Regions:
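Structural detector of well-ordered beta-strand residues that form the stable sheet scaffold
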Residues: 4, 56, 100-101, 141, ...
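Active-site beta-loop-alpha junctions enriched in small/polar residues
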Residues: 6-10, 27-31, 60-63, 105-107, ...
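Histidine-acidic metal/acid-base catalytic patches
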Residues: 2, 9-20, 51, 74-84, ...
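Hydrophobic alpha-helical segments and helix-packing faces
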Residues: 119-122, 149-153, 184
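Structural motif corresponding to the early beta-alpha repeats
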Residues: 22, 26-121, 176, 237-239
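Histidine/acidic residue-rich metal-binding segments in metalloenzymes
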Residues: 123-131
């Protein structure tokens, strides 16, 4: 499992390899009408070449569903991003195929939300998206997040059963839904065969059990020794991508925490 990070300027590109980071994750512009804001292949190449890094994944933030079901404009936008991701083939390093992370926006919020329609809308939206991904040899990775329309391991597995596409996988960021939605070890074990990429950040909780804040690895309560051990044991992910760091020191502390957990897991596996 190689280390990556979100594209940005916290660390100079020329330092990335020396600091142990081999890939960056980049973003399409969010929303249904974001095409004009998307990076061009030349823009992406400039970032990758500056750090001699691979592209861990492209990312799209989009709703796909509203209170009454699927949003056609978001579906069409996501399919366009699938095509743009496919056009970046050859840049994705250790990934067996191009990866598009879909990050759901917040769970539809309205006085008359039809929860069944939300789930059916997800199925309606993801079916043509996955068909396009299959045709173009792209892997879709759904980022499970407690505030979004795919909020637990169980919800993803229900979607996977309904859609039945090998193109539908998971972006596993445990801080997004553990332990209040799905317990940590169960989450990684259940999602392991479907996990395409993993993320690293941390989360703190209020007394009532709701999430309070997100931050860099080490700033919250996630058990990183267990998280990394389970990722190595149960998933085939090529890249573990760091996020929510605000400073260079944040990032390097997070890197050292993950490296230590990887070392401990390696020792355990040899016993």
């Amino acid at each position: 499992m190689k280390l990556g990070l979100m594209a940005g300027d916290i660390v100079a590109a020329a330092e990335l390899r020396d600091l142990g980071f081999e890939a960056v994750q980049m973003f399409f512009h969010g929303g249904a009408n974001g095409d004009s804001g998307d990076p061009k292949p030349a823009d992406i190449d400039a970032v990758l070449n500056a750090g001699n890094t691979a592209l861990a994944a492209m990312t799209l933030h989009a709703d796909l569903v509203g209170p009454q079901g699927a949003i056609q404009a978001d579906i069409e936008r996501t399919i366009r991003c699938v095509k743009k991701t496919a056009a970046l083939k050859g840049r994705f390093g250790a990934n067996p195929k191009p990866v598009l992370v879909w990050h759901p926006s917040g769970y539809p919020d309205a006085p008359q939300v039809d929860d069944r329609a939300v789930f059916e809308g997800l199925c309606q939206a993801l079916t043509p998206i996955c068909a396009a991904a299959t045709e173009l040899d792209v892997q879709i990775a759904v980022e499970i997040t407690r505030a979004g329309s795919v909020g637990s391991a169980e919800t993803f597995l229900h979607l996977k059963d309904r859609i039945g596409s090998p193109a539908l996988g998971v972006c596993l960021d445990a801080a997004n839904f553990v332990p209040d939605r799905t317990p940590l070890e169960r989450a990684v074990r259940a999602l392991g065969p479907h996990t395409v990429i993993a993320h690293g950040k941390d989360s703190c909780f209020r007394d009532n059990g709701e999430v309070d804040t997100y931050g860099p690895i080490g700033s919250g309560r996630l058990d990183y020794d267990t998280y990394i051990k389970c990722l190595l044991a149960h998933t085939p992910v090529p890249y573990f991508v760091f996020e929510y760091y605000k400073t260079r020191d944040d990032l390097l502390r997070a890197r050292d925490t993950v490296r230590a957990a990887m070392g401990a897991a390696s020792v355990l596996s040899q016993r």
